[in-house]
Amino acid sequence: MARLTSFLLLLSLICFVPLCLCDKSYGGKLFPGYYAHSCPQVNEIVRSVVAKAVARETRMAASLLRLHFHDCFVQGCDGSLLLDSSGRVATEKNSNPNSKSARGFDVVDQIKAELEKQCPGTVSCADVLTLAARDSSVLTGGPSWVVPLGRRDSRSASLSQSNNNIPAPNNTFQTILSKFNRQGLDITDLVALSGSHTIGFSRCTSFRQRLYNQSGNGSPDMTLEQSFAANLRQRCPKSGGDQILSVLDIISAASFDNSYFKNLIENKGLLNSDQVLFSSNEKSRELVKKYAEDQGEFFEQFAESMIKMGNISPLTGSSGEIRKNCRKINS
């Protein structure tokens, strides 16, 4: 009997090991079942609100993905981007990368309101952003992934980090890669995550220099495919019209697929920060070619890189708080 008891104990320990490794692989205290008991319907609530928002406006999927990216690159994935200005907070919404372009905050508010009805004071705004990003991918035809949860919300924001950490449309390849490296992301993550530009739009002000004054000498970017450039000039005047939108992916702007990479190979990347992935570095060029040829490979890496990005410096344990309202810290 004693031998049987010992055997069963050993067997239980062996069976338990993979569970421990699984949780550990998601990054410390973050794990998918974090709300299994405290808010088991969290995934369904987030998905329902995001689905309605994307059904009303497909562009919202890209906007929500962008919010998650811009949040994680500043102080980690802590919901700091969602904070409005107050006596204690200089909002990141006023930074150059976010001013007049970051959107989707109302959708986050709707998700949070529904969660507060069902599970008050339980689900963080940082986790809301992470789940909404995943659902935005799925709802436009992109990959799904299991989202590690358990982030807490910051009590601060950083306008300066938002201005300095987030890659700009006119940055060089090396500058962009350096900004990714500082977040613990590598060149593969850079190329895969840039693939989210397969959906969404960009403002004229973000790519005008490529059309009229790429090098400061009054000449356009000659690497831009000429018929594509001519069409863009019809939409984007030399001056004015800063808020005019153009699609980031001219093949399938509303579908999450690998056509973004096919555009880069044809020199039809809208932003300079897109096109340099193909024109400025051999390793990134090979990754662009690989993802253009194999959508499954792109989807698999995108999901992996999104999980990795979502694990950037999360607040866990007793750090931070669970905001009641994503726009302001708890009083």
From Swiss-Prot:
Q: Where is the signal peptide?
A: 1-22
Sites of glycosylation? N170, N213
Subcellular compartments = Secreted
Disulfide pairs? C39-C119, C72-C77, C125-C326, C204-C236
Keywords for this protein: Calcium, Disulfide bond, Glycoprotein, Heme, Hydrogen peroxide, Iron, Metal-binding, Oxidoreductase, Peroxidase, Secreted, Signal
Does this entry carry the keyword Metal-binding?
A: yes
Entry binding sites for Ca(2+) 2: T198, D249, S252, D257
Known EC number(s)? Answer: 1.11.1.7
InterPro entries per the record? Haem_peroxidase, Haem_peroxidase_sf, Peroxidase_pln, Peroxidases_AS, Peroxidases_heam-ligand_BS, Secretory_peroxidase
Q: What does this protein do?
A: Removal of H(2)O(2), oxidation of toxic reductants, biosynthesis and degradation of lignin, suberization, auxin catabolism, response to environmental stresses such as wounding, pathogen attack and oxidative stress. These functions might be dependent on each isozyme/isoform in each plant tissue.
Q: What's the family?
A: Belongs to the peroxidase family. Classical plant (class III) peroxidase subfamily.
Q: Which PANTHER family match?
A: PEROXIDASE 49 (PTHR31388:SF182), PEROXIDASE 72-RELATED (PTHR31388)
Miscellaneous note, as given in the UniProt record, is:
There are 73 peroxidase genes in A.thaliana.
Q: Would you tell me the protein name for this molecule?
A: Peroxidase 49
Species:
Arabidopsis thaliana (Mouse-ear cress)
Name the lineage: Eukaryota, Viridiplantae, Streptophyta, Embryophyta, Tracheophyta
- The gene from which this protein is expressed is PER49
